[in-house]
Structure formats: structure tokens, C-alpha cells
């Protein structure tokens, strides 16, 4: 199956923003020049034994996404890479794919050359394998690695925690093997000049776990609510001003 399309991510300043502490930034997928609202879900492994998932199951899952009026699926970085059958079904049904590399929630030994060699090999293989799927809209460096590092260390300074992976190794693999596909350093990630918080509301994508935890993870503290129950109420989603909520934290 062939597909001719352009996919861009608009991260330009939001001129309609009230400019509190400077303008926020858009995070919008532009398909063939047309902004597309991303409606979808995160894909976690369908089975504890990934090899048991059949091509027909992948096809049926993507068809269900289409029937649910989804436009995008995010392949979550704490699971497994999408199969060829899954990606082909996304091509067939017109479902865009945000695909994390398989790194999640912890620091990685960027100073271990044997490990880094494995990372380069994996990134090269996966970007080549999936390069020809028109549904592939974006590669993200991983899931919550930057967010967790910032939460613990209060910075994103370069160092042997994996920064080289997300800032150099992975984007180089995408540029080399899949140059028409967008790259985003992590999920969530930010434009630090606009919003230094990795999981903030003014730039980039964010993971909205406030409802699950009833606590602040970037969109306001529980003290803004009259009770813990109110802080965890699903109505809280309607107050979230995140630019692009790529994970809602409800299973």
C-alpha cells in the first residue's frame, strides 16, 4: 500500500493565548495542509505473550479504532513496537500513529557503550522497518523518561541518564531512515523556552494524570479543589488547558 501525504506538527506561538508569562505554543498535527484533531487512545501490549497476537487481531483492533471514530493511536513506550500487520491496518483505515521508542519512566545508562550500541541498532532497525507506512506521523523518544528525570532531579541537563539517546541517537536514526516523519524528544516533552515543565500546559504534549492521582502533575494542585474526591473527579478533564494530551491516565 502506498500513500502520499505530508504530516507536520505545528508548534508555533498561540496568538490567541492570553500571554500570561508569554504566549503558549500550539501542538497540532497538520495533514496535507489541514489541521487534524487527534482523537484516540494509547496502545499497550494486547497480551503478556506478544508473539501470540495474530495479524487478524491487530487488524480487528485497528478497525475498532476506526469504528470508534478515532484518528490517532499512540504506541506506548512501555510496551512493544507495533507489528507490521498493525501498521498496515492503520494505513488501510487512515489511523495516524504516534509511535514511542521503547524507553519508559527511568534513567538509562548513556555512559555504557555496550548498551548504547544496542540502542543504536534497535533504533536503526525499527525506523527502517516502519519507514514506508504512511500512517506513521511521529516518533517520540520514549514514555515519561524526561518527566521522571525532571521530577527527581529538577533539571534536564545533559548527562549519563539517557539524554544523548533522546537528543542525538534517536533523532539521527529518524532523519537517516524516515526523514518525512516527525521526531519528538519524549512523551511528554516541552519547548523549554515557553514552559520549562516537561508536563506543563503551555507547550508540547502532556500526560493528564490529575484525575487518577487527585494531585498536581502539571495542571494545578489538589488545593484548588474542595475535597480529594473533587480533585479526582473526571470533570477535571474539562479544565485542562494542555496543548496536546497524549495520555489520560485512566485504564
Where are these regions (language model features)?
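Substrate-binding/catalytic cleft of secreted carbohydrate-active enzymes
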Residues: 72-92, 96-251
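Active-site-adjacent substrate/metal-binding segments within catalytic domains
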Residues: 1-106, 115-138
Amino acid at each position: 500500500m502506498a500513500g502520499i501525504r505530508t504530516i507536520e506538527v505545528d508548534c508555533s506561538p498561540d496568538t490567541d493565548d492570553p500571554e500570561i508569562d508569554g504566549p503558549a505554543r500550539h501542538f497540532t498535527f497538520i495533514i496535507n495542509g489541514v489541521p487534524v484533531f487527534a482523537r484516540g487512545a494509547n496502545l499497550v501490549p494486547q497480551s503478556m505473550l506478544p508473539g501470540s497476537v495474530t495479524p487478524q487481531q491487530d487488524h480487528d483492533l485497528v478497525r475498532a479504532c476506526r469504528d470508534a471514530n478515532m484518528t490517532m493511536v499512540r504506541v506506548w513506550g512501555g510496551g512493544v513496537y507495533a507489528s507490521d500487520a498493525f501498521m498496515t491496518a492503520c494505513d488501510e483505515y487512515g489511523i495516524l500513529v504516534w509511535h514511542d521508542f521503547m524507553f519508559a519512566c527511568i534513567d538509562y545508562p548513556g555512559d555504557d557503550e555496550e548498551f548504547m550500541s544496542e540502542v543504536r541498532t534497535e533504533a536503526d532497525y525499527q525506523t527502517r522497518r516502519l519507514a514506508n507506512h504512511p500512517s506513521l506521523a511521529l516518533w517520540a523518544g520514549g514514555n515519561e523518561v524526561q518527566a521522571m528525570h525532571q521530577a527527581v532531579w529538577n533539571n534536564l541537563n545533559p548527562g549519563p541518564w539517557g539524554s544523548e539517546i533522546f537528543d542525538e541517537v534517536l533523532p539521527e536514526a529518524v532523519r537517516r531512515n524516515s526523514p518525512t516523519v516527525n521526531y519528538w524528544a519524549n512523551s511528554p516533552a516541552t519547548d523549554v523556552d515557553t514552559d520549562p515543565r516537561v508536563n506543563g500546559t503551555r507547550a508540547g504534549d502532556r500526560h493528564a494524570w490529575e484525575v487518577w492521582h487527585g494531585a498536581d502533575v502539571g495542571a494545578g494542585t489538589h488545593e484548588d479543589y474542595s475535597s480529594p474526591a473533587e480533585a479526582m473527579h473526571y470533570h477535571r478533564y474539562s479544565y485542562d488547558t494542555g496543548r496536546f494530551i497524549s495520555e489520560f491516565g485512566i485504564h
